[in-house]
Regions:
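Acidic (Asp/Glu)-rich catalytic clusters
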Residues: 33-35, 92-99, 139-143, 173, ...
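Active-site groove signature of glycoside hydrolases
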Residues: 139-158
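Beta/alpha (TIM)-barrel catalytic core signal, keyed to glycine-rich beta->alpha loops juxtaposed to Asp/Glu
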Residues: 155-348
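N-terminal binding-site loop/beta-alpha segment at the start of enzyme catalytic domains
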Residues: 6-105
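Conserved, mostly hydrophobic/aromatic
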Residues: 31, 43, 60, 75, ...
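A short, structured active-site edge motif that brings together acidic residues
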Residues: 100-112, 209
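Active-site mouth loops of central-metabolism enzymes
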Residues: 46-58, 117-129, 158, 188
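Short, acidic/polar
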Residues: 54-67, 126-142, 189-198
Length: 349
């Protein structure tokens, strides 16, 4: 049973669009069959709380305020991001208006005992004792009595199949510490079997997956399953490590601490060539390329929110304008799928 009960701290949620507090282009979607309405553009917190961030805490908090003013009500972090830094920043930013935002975090990487645990590698624990400990620590850092969406961080197939893990999550929901639970797949793209099992067998409210126009598998296979299971698919890395938002124009632009640090020069060059083959999606709507990319993703009805990554207020505002731009039609979406099937007519690296 996925719906939160009164005992689990169910609360009426007013979306930013309906609160009258924002002049915004952002729109809102319901997450599966829950009572959560999230902004179609959500904010990934890791770029503001890890080694990728070179600014101050005050500058990070200012970007959170900017996002909120733009109508963003959905913020996604992980306890391992900055070793708790992401959660602490969210706690400070929304201490006075907690009921107006939806906070998602992740647990699983045991950075408390393993200095090498960083959200990509290192020790992962999914036993009941650890999960409970990690959730309590996250609640303290977030300064809240409940987590809206708790995600199991990069679960192995063994973890996904472990009844005790999901029984622990259900118990935490009944205790009111979390409202809903899901899984965040990783590291990187892939993990098809884990995702399908979590949706079909574990009642995951959300499934977070790395997905972009250049890396559509296995993400696109999740959409059909999500329709059946009423799961919300949260898209991470929507700009393909900076290729699709213009952050990366060549191998030299790859920033330390970002997704693209794991990419080879050959991958970057191939990805840039593919991006060039997609220029028509911008021209067709007379919008910016990042806006076109986001609008294509919003074609999928199982996607309640796209978790954008940015450290720039102007870029964030550009992203938040995407939902109001003209819709793509079925034939255009089909053409993108055909280009992907042909590898965009670009030789493989």
């Amino acid at each position: 049973m996925r719906a939160a009960t009164e005992a689990a701290g169910r609360r009426p949620l007013i979306s930013a669009a309906r609160s009258g507090g924002h002049g915004t282009h952002v729109k809102y979607r319901r997450v599966g069959d829950t009572d959560l309405e999230v902004s179609e553009i959500g904010l990934a917190v890791w770029p503001l709380s890890t080694g990728a961030w070179r600014g101050s805490d005050d500058e990070a908090l200012a970007l959170f305020r900017k996002a909120y003013d733009l109508g963003v009500n959905f913020y996604d972090t992980a306890d391992v991001d900055g070793r708790g830094k992401g959660e602490e920043l969210l706690g400070k930013s929304f201490a006075g208006n907690r009921e107006m935002v939806i906070l998602a975090t992740k647990v699983g990487y045991d950075f408390y005992n393993d200095p090498a645990a960083n959200g990509v590698s290192g020790s992962r624990r999914f036993d009941a004792e650890y999960i409970r400990y990690a959730v309590d620590q996250s609640l303290a850092r977030l300064g809240t009595e409940f987590i809206d969406i708790l995600q199991v961080h990069d679960p192995t197939m063994e973890a996904v199949q472990d009844d005790a893990l999901w029984q622990t999550l259900e118990a935490l929901r009944e205790e009111g510490k979390i409202r809903y639970f899901g899984a965040a797949l990783g590291p990187g793209v892939g993990h098809h079997d884990e995702g399908v099992f979590a949706m079909r067998k574990r009642g995951a409210t959300t499934l977070s997956t790395a997905y972009n126009l250049l890396e559509q598998d296995p993400g696109r296979k999740f959409f059909t399953v999500a329709l059946e299971s009423m799961t919300g698919i949260l898209l991470r890395n929507p700009f393909a490590s900076g290729i699709l938002d213009g952050t990366v124009a060549g191998p030299a632009d790859v920033r330390t601490g970002g997704y693209a640090t794991a990419r080879s020069s050959a991958w970057v060059q191939e990805a840039l060539a593919k991006r060039g083959k997609l220029e028509w999606i911008r021209e067709a709507k007379d919008i910016t390329f990042p806006q076109a990319v986001l609008k294509v993703y919003l074609w999928e009805e199982t996607v309640p929110s796209i978790l954008v990554e940015t450290q720039d207020a102007a870029q964030l505002a550009e992203f938040c304008e995407a939902p109001e731009k003209p819709d793509y039609v079925r034939e255009e979406i089909a053409e993108i799928a055909e280009q992907y099937r042909r590898n965009f007519d670009v030789p493989k690296a």
